[in-house]
Amino acid sequence: MDKIKVGLQYWIPQHALTRLVGKLASARAGSLTTAIIRWFIKQYNVNMDEALHSDPTHFKTFNEFFVRELKAGVRPIAEGEKVITHPADACVSQFGAIEYGKLIQAKGHTYSAQELLGGDAKLAEEFRDGDFATLYLSPRDYHRVHMPCDGTLRQMIYVPGDLFSVNPLTAENVPNLFARNERVVCIFDTEFGPMAQVLVGATIVGSIELVWAGTVTPPRGNTVYRWDYPANGNQAVVLKKGEEMGRFKLGSTVINLFAKQAIRFDDSMALGAPTRMGEPYAHQA
């Protein structure tokens, strides 16, 4: 059955389906929208007690519900200049060392940092022998993505690709999943060196938005695009630890890359462990 589920993803019109779901999720359908939201909350056991607006009727579209804001204080940001915090509510899919330019996708599967970063060999070299963490956001999770540390944006890269599901089953069965799916790569300069925060798209992920650029995708295309940002001045993008940096409209995966000997993972990190935005997950080495 698992092979059938994975096999079907090669045959379905991923981009057309995603466009359709994106339009439906943005539609203002009144009581129908509310009914769908109520069903989703029950189906996925969504904790609405943490939401700033807990009444499903508050949301005019499904997307508004999906990127719901949390109440102030429910995700305190761990203090300490050397403390690196989880960027999202998720679970730990994989984490560890980048060895020979490769990251672990799942047991028996690896992929290259260079491919993940849009084929940029020079950029991948900055993370040689570094560390990575892959965090999977499930449907029930809070879907805004935050900064794990203070950072100044250096570059943003849009990489077109497939839109496979990114759940654990697919990660275990689709080679190069994260390096073949559509993604937005954000490179930040930090006090402990370069950091990549990669937002990976998936089937029915209607859009990826960033606070400094708005909606990056859609529209979708076949060309890798790069934007460079200054370190200073009016065009600089400087974000503090815990600040929102982006969001998924229907969720997906966040991947962090760190330079060699820049960090050490917190003892709480474990495969499959749930994460809460703002809690520690690494420390500056």
From Swiss-Prot:
GO molecular function term, any single one: phosphatidylserine decarboxylase activity
Cofactor: how bound: Binds 1 pyruvoyl group covalently per subunit.
PTMs per UniProt: Is synthesized initially as an inactive proenzyme. Formation of the active enzyme involves a self-maturation process in which the active site pyruvoyl group is generated from an internal serine residue via an autocatalytic post-translational modification. Two non-identical subunits are generated from the proenzyme in this reaction, and the pyruvate is formed at the N-terminus of the alpha chain, which is derived from the carboxyl end of the proenzyme.
Main location (coarse class): membrane
Membrane topology classification: Peripheral membrane protein
Top-level EC class as recorded in UniProt: lyase
Site annotation Cleavage (non-hydrolytic): residues: G251, S252
Pathway as given in its UniProt record: Phospholipid metabolism; phosphatidylethanolamine biosynthesis; phosphatidylethanolamine from CDP-diacylglycerol: step 2/2
Cofactor entry: pyruvate
Modified residues (Pyruvic acid (Ser)): S252
Keywords: Cell membrane, Decarboxylase, Lipid biosynthesis, Lipid metabolism, Lyase, Membrane, Phospholipid biosynthesis, Phospholipid metabolism, Pyruvate, Zymogen
Catalytic activity: a 1,2-diacyl-sn-glycero-3-phospho-L-serine + H(+) = a 1,2-diacyl-sn-glycero-3-phosphoethanolamine + CO2
Subcellular location: Cell membrane
Active-site positions on this chain: D89 (charge relay system), H146 (charge relay system), S252 (charge relay system), S252 (schiff-base intermediate with substrate)
Recorded family membership: Belongs to the phosphatidylserine decarboxylase family. PSD-B subfamily. Prokaryotic type I sub-subfamily.
Primary role: Catalyzes the formation of phosphatidylethanolamine (PtdEtn) from phosphatidylserine (PtdSer).
Protein name (database record): Phosphatidylserine decarboxylase proenzyme
Encoding gene (name): psd
